[in-house]
UniProtKB/Swiss-Prot annotation:
The keyword Glycoprotein does not apply. This is Sperm protamine P1. Its main location: nucleus. Testis. GO terms for biological process: chromosome condensation; sperm DNA condensation.
């Protein structure tokens, strides 16, 4: 089972509203996209409906 966590506490609220979750991946993000897309070792990606 994979666990999903949102980036920072601020993104946590956006995560639930926009259904966004963080996936564990080894991907480097640019400095500009680092704040919006990446959060440390987690990458923000859109969640698909089940």
């Amino acid at each position: 089972m994979a666990r999903y966590r949102c980036c920072r506490s601020r993104s946590r609220s956006r995560c639930r509203r926009r259904r966004r979750k963080c996936y564990r991946r080894r991907r480097r993000c640019s400095r500009k996209r680092r704040r919006r897309v990446c959060c440390r070792r987690y990458t923000v990606m859109r969640c698909r409906r089940r």
